Structure formats: structure tokens, C-alpha cells
């Protein structure tokens, strides 16, 4: 009964079940019924420790098919960069969305101690993002400071914001889901 039993909660958390029912009904429409917990079981769930270190170790063992990497350089996150690079080369696919082509995006051809590019089977997609100087909007961070700024120049080439790339991916996934015919989609 998980999230539906929150009798001890106070404040806004006490409204979580009502909020979730409304959200799930908005997502799943007529398929969200009390009998199927409004589709709650269709949502992806964390299976345990999903930290970056554990995920990279799982990738190294071949247990992860692909990764979406936004604004990180996981090939050199750990002091043992060979460990991260080897893990990345075990993926079937890798999407890197970053301001610059970094070691993660170029792991298939620019690893000084790695295999030849022809031996790497990972399909890498590099999506260039724009910097904060190249986009309008609000910016916030962990210090709870919120700022608004105007773009001072256009982004070069095909650079887009992380949000733009994510939205485009979401549109395509939605189209695929609509074609599946499954109630959860």
C-alpha cells in the first residue's frame, strides 16, 4: 500500500496521495482507476543504489545498455579514469549533452590508453548545449538564489539548451508510446 498510507504525515506531505491521484489521472486518463492504483505501478521505480559509482560499475559488467549524460564528464569523474572509460565503452549507446565535447563524449576515439576507434562498439551521440550567455531565462541553484538574465548572443551551430534536447526526446518517446497501444503508454 506504499505511498497511499500517510496518516502520520503533517503539512503538505499529507496531501501527497491526493496529488498523486490527480497527477496519474492527468497522465493516464481513463486508464487511471482505483482498481489499478491509478497506474502507480506503471511508474519506473528505483531498484536500490542508483548512484553514479554503482551505475558505472554495472556498465563495466555489461548490465547497462546506455546512458544519458547531461553536464557531467563521467569518464574522468573517478581518480581511476581507466575504470570509467572502460565502463563507458561497454555501453551499446551513450548520449552526451554538454557545452564542450569532453572525455566522455570522445571516449570512443580519443582515449590515449584505449582501444582503436574501430574496436569500440558504443554508439555515441553528442548534443551540443548552449551556455547561460546564449539563452534567456531564469537560473537557480542550490543556494536558492534565483536570477533572470537576457541572452547576450546567439548560440553557435546546433547548440540548444538541455531543456530543448530533453523536450525533443520526450516528444519522440511520446510518439513511440502512443503507437504501442499499451494502457501504461
Locations of regions flagged by a protein language model:
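Non-catalytic alpha/beta scaffold blocks inside enzyme catalytic domains
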Residues: 2-185
Amino acid at each position: 500500500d506504499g505511498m497511499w498510507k500517510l496518516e502520520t504525515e503533517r503539512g503538505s506531505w499529507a496531501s501527497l496521495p491526493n496529488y498523486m491521484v490527480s497527477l496519474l489521472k492527468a497522465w493516464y486518463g481513463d486508464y487511471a482507476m482505483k482498481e489499478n492504483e491509478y497506474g502507480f505501478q506503471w511508474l519506473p521505480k528505483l531498484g536500490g543504489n542508483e548512484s553514479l559509482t554503482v551505475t558505472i560499475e554495472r556498465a563495466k559488467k555489461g548490465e547497462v545498455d546506455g546512458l544519458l549524460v547531461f553536464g557531467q564528464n563521467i569518464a574522468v569523474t573517478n581518480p581511476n579514469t581507466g575504470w570509467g572509460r572502460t565502463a563507458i565503452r561497454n555501453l551499446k549507446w551513450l548520449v552526451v549533452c554538454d557545452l564542450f565535447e569532453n572525455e566522455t563524449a570522445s571516449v570512443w576515439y580519443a582515449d590515449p590508453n584505449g582501444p582503436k576507434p574501430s574496436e569500440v562498439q558504443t554508439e555515441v551521440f553528442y548534443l551540443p548545449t548552449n551556455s547561460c550567455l546564449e539563452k534567456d531565462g531564469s537560473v537557480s541553484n542550490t543556494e536558492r538564489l534565483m536570477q533572470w538574465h537576457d541572452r547576450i548572443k546567439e548560440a553557435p551551430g546546433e547548440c540548444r539548451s538541455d531543456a530543448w534536447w530533453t523536450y525533443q526526446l520526450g516528444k519522440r518517446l511520446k510518439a513511440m508510446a502512443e503507437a504501442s497501444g499499451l494502457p501504461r503508454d
